[in-house]
Regions:
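Conserved donor-binding/catalytic core segment of Leloir-type glycosyltransferases
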Residues: 191, 233-251, 257-261
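Membrane-proximal helix-turn-helix segments that form the acceptor-binding/catalytic region
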Residues: 131, 144-190, 204
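Short hydrophobic beta-strand element within catalytic cores of glycosyltransferases
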Residues: 311, 335-338
Length: 410
């Protein structure tokens, strides 16, 4: 097949999980013998991604306009025309290239784009976050998971104390956007990276079917090479805990360290890889001989550090849709500690052995489990092919080959 992958998150020097997922998929599709090109943002050449940007096809940098603010911050309200305008622009760009491909697969943050594509275009989008009904994409506000379906409540996400006009205009923007997204999902094929995302969207939009679920995936061959290299190193003394996360409230790193610090056992060392708006404060509060902050780390270094640890902690307090860091921890053979929320419980199917994914209802119980856990615990390998990009690519190819516009179950 001739396949066009589309993502405004590519290319950038430090790419997030969505971009890496799309590139990983592109490489898997090329390995399977398909022609794959990538339509991305026009801000940088693909070279800024380094080795991560190599996928075996042509890069087309044309997507633009999605960073426009429309003075929403200045006015303290969401503007109803903003997201339809961005979606129309993306659709226009996509349609310039659609005749050259058998299928278009979109990975991005403009879920209403399908609303502006003709029904005969074979278009698939993967939803990686909760941006189908939440302008913040996270369903997380004031340190708590947000489960409100009232569009008027969304006004507080741009202005904590909206006046009547701001509240009414923001509500109108959310109502229109959610309606357009629902029309998009009805008109074209939609993939969710977890059942959690599908359920949460149905909470606002009503019963579906809204799409099908294909979990995130990883390059298991690459991970197993990293794992093997780590196994050849001499064992380190102590209990080494590794966290890779952006340092801001939703990721829960500060809450985890706050709970752990008073109980930190002698010999336990916690290494945090990642940067973010809370990094400076967290360094000042927690950094010491047993808690170290590395700042942003390149992906290869991050995986090497994870492979050398005795345990992985993914302390997110928001509803992670399908955390790649959890998958990486499991496939590296590590006990992986996380909260029982979001799409994370679904990832227990990727355990090598029962109990490898250690889920907890709150941070206190997670920390209690961690500080009493045997750092010498080892896990085997998950079933061959499970969670790998090549298997997911075959699932997605089945969706690609189904008729345009319909829902497809895998």
């Amino acid at each position: 097949m001739r396949i066009l992958i589309v993502s405004e998150d590519i290319p950038f020097p430090n790419m997030g999980g969505l971009a890496k997922h799309a590139l990983n998929l592109a490489r898997a599709l090329v390995r399977a013998g398909h022609h794959v090109d990538l339509l991305g943002c026009d801000e940088h050449p693909i070279d800024v991604c380094g080795e991560e940007g190599k996928f075996g096809g042509r890069f087309i940098g044309e997507l633009n306009g999605h960073h426009a603010g429309w003075k929403e911050i200045s006015f303290g309200m969401f503007m109803p025309p903003k997201r339809p305008s961005i979606a129309r622009n993306f659709a226009k760009i996509i349609l310039r290239h659609a005749p050259n491909y058998d299928v278009i697969h979109y990975h991005g943050h403009i879920p209403n784009v399908a609303r502006y594509l003709p029904p005969d275009v074979n278009f698939v989008q993967t939803r990686h976050d909760q941006g189908g009904d939440c302008f913040r994409h996270t369903r997380f506000r004031e340190g708590q998971i947000c489960d409100s379906i009232d569009p008027a409540e969304c006004a507080k996400c741009i202005n904590p104390t909206p006046n009547a006009i701001q509240r009414a205009v923001s509500k109108a923007a959310v109502v229109r956007f959610r309606r357009d997204v629902a029309q998009s999902f009805r008109a074209h094929k939609t993939v969710f990276v977890s059942d959690l995302l599908s359920r949460n969207f149905a909470r606002c939009a009503g019963p579906g079917p809204w799409g099908t679920t294909v979990h995130n995936f990883v390059d298991r061959n690459a991970l197993e090479k990293v794992r093997h290299a780590a196994s050849l190193l001499p064992p380190r003394e102590g209990f080494h805990v590794f966290i890779a996360a952006k340092l801001y409230p939703a990721k829960g790193v500060e809450q985890f360290l706050h709970a752990l610090a008073p109980r930190l056992p002698k010999g336990m060392v916690v290494t945090v890889a990642g940067d973010g708006p809370d990094e400076k404060r967290m360094r000042e509060k927690f950094e010491g001989s047993q808690i170290e902050f590395l700042g942003w780390c390149a992906p290869d270094r991050t995986l090497k550090l994870a492979s050398m640890a005795n345990a992985i902690v993914v302390p997110s307090v928001w509803e992670e849709p399908c955390a790649t860091t959890v998958l990486e921890g499991l496939f590296l053979g590590k006990p992986t500690f996380a909260l029982r929320r979001g799409g994370t419980p679904e990832l227990a199917v990727y355990e090598a052995e029962p109990g490898q994914l250690r889920l907890h209802d709150d941070m206190a119980s997670l920390v209690s489990d961690l500080v009493t856990f045997d750092p010498g615990t080892r896990y085997g390998f998950a079933a061959e092919g499970l969670g790998c990009a090549d298997r997911a690519a075959q699932q997605l190819l089945e969706i690609y080959r189904s008729p345009p516009g319909g829902h497809h179950r895998v």
